[in-house]
UniProtKB/Swiss-Prot annotation:
WD repeats lie at residues 106-147, 148-187, 190-229, 232-271, 274-333, 336-377, 379-410. Residues 56-82 form a coiled coil. This is Lissencephaly-1 homolog B. It holds the Pfam family WD40. GO terms for cellular component: 1-alkyl-2-acetylglycerophosphocholine esterase complex; axon cytoplasm; centrosome; cytoplasm; cytoplasmic microtubule; kinetochore; microtubule associated complex; neuron projection. GO terms for biological process: apical protein localization; brain morphogenesis; cell division; establishment of mitotic spindle orientation; germ cell development; microtubule organizing center organization; microtubule sliding; nuclear migration. Can self-associate. Component of the cytosolic PAF-AH (I) heterotetrameric enzyme, which is composed of PAFAH1B1 (beta), PAFAH1B2 (alpha2) and PAFAH1B3 (alpha1) subunits. The catalytic activity of the enzyme resides in the alpha1 (PAFAH1B3) and alpha2 (PAFAH1B2) subunits, whereas the beta subunit (PAFAH1B1) has regulatory activity. Trimer formation is not essential for the catalytic activity. Interacts with dynein, dynactin, nde1 and ndel1. Regulatory subunit (beta subunit) of the cytosolic type I platelet-activating factor (PAF) acetylhydrolase (PAF-AH (I)), an enzyme that catalyzes the hydrolyze of the acetyl group at the sn-2 position of PAF and its analogs and participates in the PAF inactivation. Regulates the PAF-AH (I) activity in a catalytic dimer composition-dependent manner. Positively regulates the activity of the minus-end directed microtubule motor protein dynein. May enhance dynein-mediated microtubule sliding by targeting dynein to the microtubule plus end.
């Protein structure tokens, strides 16, 4: 790039000013002679400190250019993935976008679990402050607090109608709440330690729980009686989740394994052992994900014609793994989180996986290509839980920063 005569003259004067003001007298007088500079005081004032100013502004501009380039690349990616250009995107591909729609405060300790109500525009959060709070996620309003547990509430689960809510706690109990009257209708005792996970079975007749006492138990909703105990994990069972038809249970544990159980017989059908640390969370793949999973893994439909079932697991080893339960094989490992993975789910459309972790982020994975396609800085502290609404374009997250955040998807 060639400078004009005027630009060259200005640059020379700026260099001369720099040399003189920094005490390089010999270099200054040599340079002045060689550049044939006629220096007077009026001009000097104009060029005082000019070289430094130009230098710092160039660095600032470079930084800005790099920021803009990365934003441009992100925008290009969104366009190739069918990003939010106009409103042509299929809702099956909507993903959460920053910033959050609401940041809801009210809990006095870390939030441990967040879930959407299956029918109304409500969500529920559980916390180490021993309370459960109900919020309207569309309006961002606090509705009410459910009190009854005497220690940290670890997990919550709705039945499919949304009329019953189950909760479990470090106080070693499981509670069943009438979500229409917001009253506790039953308390179940039987675990010998912190109850870390609870889920109402799809048929609504039974509740399943997992505990630090290394067992899982099944309870009758009508009576509150424990009807089954599942044993096999060697350490704290972190989470338990039934599959869509309630015939299988998946569990994960501090013993670094994921296990799948047949509900009817209590037998352990699979033990999945590739994680290298505590497995924190699990999630079953919905039917909507089966085509993409088969495409991604090249697993042709088996002789029965029905693929799967498939399961996701997230671990303190910072990875997410996808499993084919029929073979016990790990189909893929998603690497990208910088800390413990605390929550993992399939996008309701089936094409993406969404996760949250102690690296304070929410991540969306294009698992067909095994890559993280979006990272959202979600909270100021560890993100402990997330839920994706099955029908409305919302994601909710909970954190050790004591807030619950609602994210809109588009």
């Amino acid at each position: 790039m060639v400078l004009s005569q005027r630009q060259r003259d200005e640059l020379n004067r700026a260099i001369a000013d720099y040399l003189r003001s920094n005490g390089y007298e010999e270099a200054y007088s040599t340079f002045k002679k060689e550049a044939e500079l006629d220096v007077n005081d009026e001009l000097d004032k104009k060029f005082a400190g000019l070289l430094e100013k130009k230098w710092t502004s160039v660095i600032r501009l470079q930084k800005k250019v790099m920021e803009l380039e990365s934003k441009l690349n992100e925008a290009k990616e969104e366009i190739t993935l069918g990003g939010p250009v106009g409103q042509k995107r299929d809702p099956k591909e909507w993903i959460p976008r920053p910033p959050e729609k609401y940041a809801l405060s009210g809990h006095r300790s870390p939030v441990t679990r967040v879930i959407f109500h299956p029918v109304f525009s409500l969500m529920v959060s559980a916390s180490e402050d021993a309370t459960i709070k109900v919020w309207d996620y569309e309006a961002g309003d606090f509705e009410r607090t459910l009190k009854g547990h005497t220690d940290s509430v670890q997990d919550i689960s709705f039945d499919q109608t949304g009329k019953l809510l189950a909760s479990c706690s470090a106080d070693m109990t499981i509670k069943l709440w009438d979500f229409q009257g917001f009253e506790c209708i039953r308390t179940m005792h039987g675990h010998d330690h912190n109850v870390s996970s609870v889920a109402i079975m799809p048929n609504g007749d039974h509740i399943v729980s997992a505990s630090r006492d290394k067992t899982m138990k099944m309870w009758e909703v009508a009576t509150g009686y424990c009807v089954k105990t599942f044993t096999g994990h060697r350490e704290w069972v972190r989470m338990v989740r039934p599959n869509q038809d309630g015939t299988l249970l998946a569990s994960c544990s501090n013993d670094q394994t994921v296990r799948v159980w047949v509900v009817a017989t209590k037998e352990c059908k699979a033990e999945l052992r590739e994680h290298e640390h505590v497995v924190e969370c699990i999630s079953w793949a919905p039917e909507s994900a089966h085509p993409t999973i088969s495409e991604a893994t090249g697993s042709e439909n088996k002789k029965s014609g029905k693929p799967g079932p498939f399961l996701l697991s997230g671990s303190r080893d910072k990875t997410i793994k996808m499993w084919d339960i029929s073979t016990g094989m790990c189909l893929m490992t998603l690497v990208g989180h910088d800390n413990w993975v605390r929550g993992v789910l399939f996008h309701p459309g089936g094409r993406f996986v969404v996760s949250c972790a102690d690296d304070k982020t929410l991540r969306i994975w294009d698992y067909k290509n095994k890559r993280c396609m979006k990272t959202l800085s979600a909270h100021e502290h560890f993100v402990t839980s997330l839920d994706f609404h099955k029908a409305s374009p919302y994601v909710v997250t909970g954190s050790v920063d004591q807030t619950v955040k609602v994210w809109e998807c588009r």
